[in-house]
Design a protein with these regions (language model features):
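Structured adenosyl-cofactor binding patch, chiefly the S-adenosyl-L-methionine
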Residues: 8, 43-45, 59-73, 125-164
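Short basic, glycine-rich beta-strand/loop surfaces that mediate nucleic-acid
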Residues: 5-9, 68, 111-117
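Conserved beta-strand segments that form the floor/walls of ligand-binding pockets within enzyme
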Residues: 7-9, 24-25, 51, 114, ...
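Active-site/ligand-binding-proximal alpha/beta "capping" segment
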Residues: 95-145
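Gly/Ser/Thr-rich helix-start
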Residues: 6, 37, 71, 96, ...
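Extended, non-globular alpha-helical segments
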Residues: 1-17
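Short, surface-exposed amphipathic charged segments that create phosphate/polyanion-binding patches used
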Residues: 1-2, 89-94, 108, 150
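RNA substrate-binding interface of SAM-dependent RNA methyltransferases
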Residues: 14-99
């Protein structure tokens, strides 16, 4: 059941992206519930800024706000051209990709850019070309019928390896 009435009132503030040694970049995230959950998960792991492609859902969408459970007021979401961002930062780029190496076999640094694509389309081909290391979360065994993990779940698993 959807809530009735106002969910939250936000004063939309424009922030300046801080220079960090670690960035989460989201490519084409269209599901508001996923973006809200990602914002909440990022806050849990101490990440206070996220970069989204310009074709991602608006972070002030009511479903994003609801799913973020208040984290949107503490995690800043920026919209940018991802290719330009990657070129500007000149950092090692990881990409969550079903065809990548097992994340538990990859030496993952606590720095760089992590790119996550939408569940339905993955990371855009032009961005895939910029990725230095594709990483996947393997199934526990090949008999598992589920095709993939939910995007926020994948992000949470990877962040737990990097940030804890």
């Amino acid at each position: 059941k959807s809530p009735n009435g106002d969910l939250a009132v936000f004063n939309i503030t424009y922030y300046t992206l801080k220079n960090e040694n670690f960035y989460i970049v989201l490519d084409g995230i269209n599901d508001p519930g996923n973006l809200g959950t990602i914002i909440r998960t990022c806050e849990w792991f101490g990440i206070n800024q996220i970069i989204c492609s310009k074709n991602s859902v608006d972070c002030y969408n009511s479903k994003v706000i609801q799913a973020s459970m208040g984290s949107l007021s503490r995690v800043h979401v920026f919209y940018d051209e991802i290719l330009s961002f990657i070129d500007l930062k000149k950092m090692y780029v990881y990409g969550a990709d079903i065809n990548g190496e097992r994340y538990d076999d990859v030496k993952i640094k606590n720095s760089g850019i992590w790119v996550f694509g939408s569940e339905s389309h993955g990371i855009s081909k032009n961005i895939i070309a910029k990725i230095d290391k594709k990483v996947k979360i393997p199934k526990s065994n090949d008999s598992i019928k589920t095709e993939s993990l939910n995007l926020p779940v994948s992000l949470g698993i990877i962040l737990s390896k990097i940030r804890l």
